[in-house]
Amino acid sequence: MRGPVEIAGGIYGLGSEGVNWYLVEDGGRLTAVDAGLPKFRETLEADLRAIGHAPGDVDAVVLTHSDSDHTGVVPALRDAGARVLIHSADDETLRHPGPKKGEAAPARALPRVAWRWRFWKVMGQMTLAGGAKPPKIEGAETFADGDVLPVPGRPRVVHTPGHTDGHSVLLFEDRSTLFVGDALCTVNFFTGRPGPQLMPGPTNVSTSQARESLAAIEPLEANLLLPGHGEPWHGSPTAAVAQARALL
């Protein structure tokens, strides 16, 4: 696991080699965008202390979606007083986590990736970090496409289904920063291919829907994209989407 890295003014990246989550500081308070894997709880207090904060300074955890590598430290932050927010279409899987459906259902996904050694490396890392035992999170507040959330930084929600039914990206307009979750990644963790691209097909509920959701990302105005997997990408959503489409 890595400690917090300031990516831009008041925006911090945390997590591990393969999984990112973020903190956005605004007016002395924090919004967490996603929440990594359960094992990240072990360093949570130290990570926050490193940027001059404590768990009680996190007002909200805004989740791009309900996958287990994005919800891990939610219980610890909620216990410290944070609200939890997610798109209404992912609330059910947040409350009752289990195997994904569609293309990502194990029976469909495994035959497509089981021969890749990187797949087993990634799955091993995530399992050791608690990804196979995600927390059950009840009572989250739900949002919808177009909502501007009343949390530090006031992100605007753009619904981008495909990776999950409720997947959403979050635009912090005053920071010109787009948190893309798993609508885009900047590295394919099964092949190592770098650059903006869709998540690997076997991880998506519907890759065709994820492809269609690129149209919602393309016109957004930002100069920094922060993914759930891979390095920050400096450039416009339009340029990132063009690169992703070129790989389809």
Question: Can you annotate each of these PLM segments?
Answer:
Residues 2-51, 170-186:
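Conserved beta-strand hairpin/beta-sheet module of binuclear metal-dependent hydrolase folds
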Residues 7, 79-80, 221:
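Short, structured coil segments at secondary-structure junctions
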Residues 19, 39, 68-69, 92, ...:
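Short alpha-helical
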Residues 31-33, 62, 84, 177-179, ...:
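Residue-level marker for buried hydrophobic side chains located in beta-strands
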Residues 37-39, 129-138, 148-150, 154-161, ...:
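Metallo-beta-lactamase
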Residues 49-139:
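Active-site HxH/HxHxD metal-binding segment of metal-dependent hydrolases
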Residues 232-248:
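Binuclear metal-ion centers of metallo-dependent hydrolases, dominated by the metallo-beta-lactamase
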